[in-house]
A protein has these predicted regions:
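Charge-rich, low-complexity N-terminal segments
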Residues: 1-49, 53-112
Length: 112
């Protein structure tokens, strides 16, 4: 799907705000060392898919922590953004880092 510049700005704004909230406002240790890799906000801004990465061993822990903290993150996000609607947050694991590591490992083995 093609994104316009305003859509990219909205997605980046959402990513920056959520990353800041995790860094400064959420004290759950299970959400430490989590990286927000991207956001996709729907056209009407009612839904925001939030992509994150974490260590493989912590996938389930982090998913549960996001489920518990999503309401708090949403309310803090609504305060910081001047959008009419606070979007529903859907946290999704970004497996692109895992894929990149797997490819790099395969290339390293082949080169050796």
């Amino acid at each position: 799907m093609k994104q316009g510049s305003s859509s990219r700005k909205v997605n980046e704004q959402a990513r920056e705000v959520i990353a800041s909230i995790l860094l400064f406002d959420i004290s759950d240790p299970k959400l430490s060392m989590v990286t927000i890799t991207g956001c996709e906000v729907s056209f009407d801004r009612s839904v925001c898919n939030v992509y994150y990465s974490a260590e493989k061993e912590r996938y389930d822990q982090v998913a549960e922590a996001f489920t518990r903290a999503s309401g708090r993150i949403r309310s803090l996000m609504a305060r910081r953004l001047s959008w009419r609607v606070a979007p529903e947050l859907r946290f999704m694991l970004d497996r692109s880092v895992d894929t990149a590591e797997r490819i790099a490992g395969a290339l390293a083995r082949e080169a050796a």
